[in-house]
Amino acid sequence: MIKTTLLFFATALCEIIGCFLPWLWLKRNASIWLLLPAGISLALFVWLLTLHPAASGRVYAAYGGVYVCTALIWLRVVDGVKLSLYDWTGALIALCGMLIIVAGWGRA
């Protein structure tokens, strides 16, 4: 389960980077060349999703919990926003949901 969780975090990071770089280009007038690494990051994101052994819908559902946590880490580290109690609580609930889904992969 640790390997799956780490793979989900890597996947989420690729998705966030792949979306953040075009956001920088559009919102902050960053270089259009940021679209190249963004495309690579999003392609890597898609490829990483294929490495999970479960049905795609189950993978996407479980991945969502890790994405929430990764996005909040990004919010704190990159955007410099202090996380609230609601952020922490929501992340914990999302992560618990992911763990429940992943625990049932072999039984479904």
From Swiss-Prot:
Topological domains annotated Cytoplasmic: 27-30, 82-84
One GO cellular component term noted in the UniProt record for this chain: plasma membrane
Topology, Periplasmic side: 1-5, 52-60, 106-108
Pfam families assigned: UPF0060
Segments traversing the membrane: 6-26, 31-51, 61-81, 85-105
Name assigned to this protein: UPF0060 membrane protein YnfA
Membrane topology: Multi-pass membrane protein
Entry keyword set: Cell inner membrane, Cell membrane, Membrane, Transmembrane, Transmembrane helix
Cellular compartments annotated: Cell inner membrane
Record organism: Escherichia coli O7:K1 (strain IAI39 / ExPEC)
Similarity annotation: Belongs to the UPF0060 family.
